[in-house]
Amino acid sequence: MSDLTGNRAGTGAGAEGGTGLGAGTGAEAGAAIGAGVGDDGRPVALIASRVRFEEKLLLEAFRRRGAAVAVIDDRTLSYRIGDPAPPWRVACNRSLAGTRRLEVSRMCEAFGVPVVNSSATVAVCDNKIHSTLVLHAAGLPVPDTAVALTPAAGEEALRRIGLPAVVKPVNGSWGRGLCKVNDIDAVEGVLALKESLPSPQQHLIYAQEFVRTPQRDIRVVVAGDRAVTAVHRTGDHWIGNVARGARTTRCPLTPELEDLALRAAKAVGGGLLGVDLLESDDGRLLVNEVNSGVEFRGAAVGDEATALAIAEAFADHVLDHADRGAPGAGPVPSQESDHP
């Protein structure tokens, strides 16, 4: 059994500058899991792919609360089954890639380290079929949705919800891979493309009604049991995503919006989340999806006080989660056995 080494990646120049998570840390950086240990030996592990605007504010928020922080580059993480647990009080999972985000949370939970978000929450949010099933089962309003397990069955699925419709990848973010299909020719083209893709996962068809909106959607940022802020995302394209050039403006956080966002967050397991809502032209308010890797620079709408308030709420939730502890604490079980 090997020990986890002391990886202090990003606790110095790399973290403050935001240019990388291992800057100036020496040869040991990235060798294995580890932490820059604070005075009490129990730092908050801020696990990230890179230090962006949001991570810098989170670092400041944790430190204002007297917490030692170890910034860990998720690209350097490795561990051996049976290793002792890293000396982390709690982990704040800010991994960019969905696959790494899920494995980071699973790793922390296996070691008995409280982590936000949980692997259960990440697994639900990062699979659009799973999340829509969960939201619908919780009684939340969602767009009319159909699923087909192969492209060959996709035409029937789309026929059931009607056109126009939107075909989405099961996994993905930032508005990538969405296809609006207006007629049967477009349907046949998209399904043929899906059939040609190499991965069986890419053959799954996840389709939703095209919800006609005032060319905008709503993002509600949630921290635990608190809806922190809400914004309208308005763009020139039907995909209302900041990564696609949408503009954000303040949205009044009405009791209806707050209730819907908190119910959606609770349904997927809670944590630090971005709940995306659609206002349809016919008066419906629908839960489109819930994001487990929420970015909040856009939600701050250029206002420093709002950005700080979001970071403070996130830090409070993570530290509260640390105080509650994590279920199933203990080392990752080894395959080694005393039995012959």
Could you describe each region identified by the protein language model?
Residues 165, 206, 228-229, 273, ...:
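Protein kinase-like catalytic core scaffold
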Residues 89-90, 220-222, 283-298:
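A short beta-strand motif that forms the metal-chelation/ATP-contact edge
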Residues 1-121, 149:
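ATP-binding N-terminal substructure of ATP-dependent carboxylate-amine bond-forming enzymes
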Residues 179-268:
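Phosphate-binding site of ATP-dependent enzymes
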Residues 237-244, 296-305:
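A short, polar/charged loop-to-alpha-helix boundary motif
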Residues 239-287, 308-327, 334-340:
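A long amphipathic alpha-helix within ATP-dependent nucleotide-binding catalytic cores
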Residues 2-4, 39-41, 48, 84, ...:
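Active-site nucleotide/adenylate-binding loops and adjacent lid/helix of ATP-dependent enzymes
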